[in-house]
């Protein structure tokens, strides 16, 4: 799975994914701002209610016929985004993965998208870690008990289960790191974190508050939301903006310090295979810089893109994953 990464044999980023010189907004016309449906990128969508709770999570899936002898990728979006920020990455992985050994699931975190919980405003890291571990394990149970996947208690059958790789961007990266450190996810194999590092995240919290204060709380139309995302450089890929920005309300968002505290140490302590994807070396803090030089995790840099790497340059995360 990670062999190509460790051999350093990855191809270069597709230059067509990055716009140089004239801004993307200047290149687009009014007719270019339109929305597309999630079903152009995913196989299906459904809601999963966790047993014993009032929490119902919206999930999007691809390659749902993969139930054993392969990998299960679970994607967690960043704060203020939804599962659909992974649309292009999931679609490109599906089209590249001709042998269909990879199943993919994205879910809307609480307080985001179409997920409904008993307390949507509770975005504490402890709560979101509980959500992550409980949902992934329950989702695996659904695969093995209802969809004919590998299951049972004997060791041979256990080996047939899908190996779980959790992928998180920004806030989602914090959640997957801290969930991984609890050892609560069954069959966890890999951990991929996109553009979140403890040191730089904590330093950026004060400036992030002022940025969020200028962010519109709502838009008159989806078209206006897409226009704003491009003109503000929030998203640098019009194709991704068309599918990920399907809503016009509830754009308010905030950050909590506990998302990032202790992040570097917990990332390094995880027993899973670890990959960190960043938009630049300036995002590395001291602890991770030293650990990377010691070979404790794999680092991939994708320059020339913004914070939302999986939307700006979907070919980058797709190739690395």
UniProtKB/Swiss-Prot annotation:
Listed SUPFAM superfamilies: alpha/beta-Hydrolases
Keyword Hydrolase: yes
Reaction(s) this enzyme catalyzes, per UniProt: [phosphatase 2A protein]-C-terminal L-leucine methyl ester + H2O = [phosphatase 2A protein]-C-terminal L-leucine + methanol + H(+)
Pfam family, one: Abhydrolase_6
Keywords: Hydrolase, Serine esterase
Enzyme class name: hydrolase
Family: Belongs to the AB hydrolase superfamily.
Protein role: Demethylates proteins that have been reversibly carboxymethylated.
Name of the protein in question: Probable protein phosphatase methylesterase 1
Name of the gene: ppme1
